[in-house]
Amino acid sequence: MEGEGRGRWALGLLRTFDAGEFAGWEKVGSGGFGQVYKVRHVHWKTWLAIKCSPSLHVDDRERMELLEEAKKMEMAKFRYILPVYGICQEPVGLVMEYMETGSLEKLLASEPLPWDLRFRIVHETAVGMNFLHCMSPPLLHLDLKPANILLDAHYHVKISDFGLAKCNGMSHSHDLSMDGLFGTIAYLPPERIREKSRLFDTKHDVYSFAIVIWGVLTQKKPFADEKNILHIMMKVVKGHRPELPPICRPRPRACASLIGLMQRCWHADPQVRPTFQEITSETEDLCEKPDEEVKDLAHEPGEKSSLESKSEARPESSRLKRASAPPFDNDCSLSELLSQLDSGISQTLEGPEELSRSSSECKLPSSSSGKRLSGVSSVDSAFSSRGSLSLSFEREASTGDLGPTDIQKKKLVDAIISGDTSRLMKILQPQDVDLVLDSSASLLHLAVEAGQEECVKWLLLNNANPNLTNRKGSTPLHMAVERKGRGIVELLLARKTSVNAKDEDQWTALHFAAQNGDEASTRLLLEKNASVNEVDFEGRTPMHVACQHGQENIVRTLLRRGVDVGLQGKDAWLPLHYAAWQGHLPIVKLLAKQPGVSVNAQTLDGRTPLHLAAQRGHYRVARILIDLCSDVNICSLQAQTPLHVAAETGHTSTARLLLHRGAGKEALTSEGYTALHLAAQNGHLATVKLLIEEKADVMARGPLNQTALHLAAARGHSEVVEELVSADLIDLSDEQGLSALHLAAQGRHSQTVETLLKHGAHINLQSLKFQGGQSSAATLLRRSKT
């Protein structure tokens, strides 16, 4: 059977396969090219891909086309070309190596990619195309686009789909058909659209490569908003290229050079476009030095392309400042960068900032033994001996002990802290991704804490677990939200991240967003169904926290989500209590007007929002609460009214407000104190004056039958004593028979004693017992007696 197949197909070194050799058929892709199945070879014990013809019944012409594609791929055996093994006889299909990551098109649409990976993909694609063009005769791909650039498990490029590939100079009039062109038309050069009979040449692929660069830079599809193929063709012929949106921070400096290369590659004149041999030299430099000055690659071509540009760049999104920050001073669009390159404007670029903390902070133990794990150089070109040596060395060094060692751990930590994504891409191994550091944190925790967004992207691409916790119970999401790292938050939420995970204080990520007033992160979390009712160890929901920290924007966001503002926290505190306590007037107004909210709601100890505002002296909050019908005479469990609280804490303006709004000035606490007693006892002169002006009873007796004068004298508040003293009060005794003078002398308050003596306080036997002391009060008493 196999011999018959070989003769029939004339495959040369390729082999034929029977359907029985494969198991577990799973469709992984379909389109105009047919269907692609993931299969497992029964004997080889490995996964392969089979691209089957779109037709149910394959005729001789389709068989020949499939055979031709297989032969081209066989001829083009190379590191960045997808390996082909042969032909499956039934169903008829091309048997190839299975690429776990899938196509570049799929990857670009899935999540933001690290810049180092983007540069590497561009470079490896260029190296693969250079190999094809260096064949004799040159092999033209003619359908280079992200859908035909596959990526292995380590995100290395494998160029595929040689169905349209031809040798240099060949042409057929039927090559440009309208069937299946929608995904390809944007990658066709203008000369091919204008002249169907034009001979193919290498510059066709160079133009397509430019559009691939555009897609890698923007992670968008070219002309995505244009639904009419003819309109796209007309635009391209007229010199228009895909629109150039802003490239937001962070971005390496080499981005400008890559844009210049892209501009030359999509030039309207094919002769101006560089060859892939020239391109690979430039992309290799970009990969090696993405954050350093790179030679000017954007020299002015003979004729400028007509480009659609935008004059304004998007404002930079609020995000955590990265420790390694190589971006330009200002955000600018691709078109703005191009205009700067075209006009020859030199840009002064700041160097990357360095992270303040050093890798030594991680306290990694020294390694007694270890192995150097295998890695793949990201910049080795097809003809670079340096790249080959690097690869050879790392592979040989990979044999050794199993598992990551301390020295490998230190390399990973150093790469992440320094923001060296290129280094991280080379040394990170699958078994290292969820490595636990000495602080019980993962590499992902470290990257988030250091603000290294590019490293976070690479770790997530390698399936780092976003739900691991450190010693404090924090996940990377907790840390990212706490540090307001919006970009990192978006990356984490794009994964299967637990949005309601709690740290050691029972805080969720939404608690941190509420505390920081981070509306962007709050919205992102709510879109991922973050719970608004999770409570921390003090019973606070995110709404409580937002009110406590005065984050009105978060309060409004949560209210729009229907959050229950009547949900009680610890000790029955409502969000309104927290807002009143902290004096956040706009939030108090907002909450007090919500349906079902009572401005007289009491905490476990009986305090209302008005009590709390009075205690902290938040006059404007107290006024709005009173305007909203808060009871000025409501009592706490200790029978304190808001006036008692204001007097005790000395907030005179608030006390005046309460008095003018009907607060009872003679109300007694559970211990028998009036507002005047509390103001005098605590030495609040202005409040005492206010209460006296408001006709508060200075003769009123409190605990131990003491007047306000007794209380002020006992505490040594001489100025208050001066205000309260009168002939009727000065020698009054409490239930222990002590006058104000006795109490002042007992407390050794000499200035108060002097004040009372000055006003004629009587010295009796009870007072004389203090004369034996050495205090200044005793001295005053002795002098007065004599």
Curated annotation (Swiss-Prot):
It comes from Mus musculus (Mouse). Belongs to the protein kinase superfamily. TKL Ser/Thr protein kinase family. Expressed in the epidermis of the skin (at protein level). Ubiquitously expressed, with an abundant expression in the thymus, bone marrow, pro-B, pre-B and immature B cells and a weak expression in the spleen. Residues 22-286 form the Protein kinase domain. ANK repeats lie at residues 439-468, 472-501, 505-534, 538-567, 571-601, 605-634, 638-667, 671-700, 704-734, 736-765. One of its GO terms (cellular component) is cytoplasm. Disruption phenotype: Conditional skin knockouts in embryos show significantly thicker skin and aberrant skin stratification with Krt14 expression extending into the suprabasal layers throughout the epidermis. Adults show a similarly thickened epidermis, with expansion of the spinous layer and basal cells independent of proliferation rate. 60% of adults develop spontaneous facial tumors when aged. It is found in: Cytoplasm; Membrane. The record marks D342, S343, D380, S381 as: Cleavage. Its main location: cytoplasm. This is Receptor-interacting serine/threonine-protein kinase 4. It is an enzyme of class 2 (transferase). It comes from the Eukaryota. It catalyses: L-seryl-[protein] + ATP = O-phospho-L-seryl-[protein] + ADP + H(+); L-threonyl-[protein] + ATP = O-phospho-L-threonyl-[protein] + ADP + H(+).
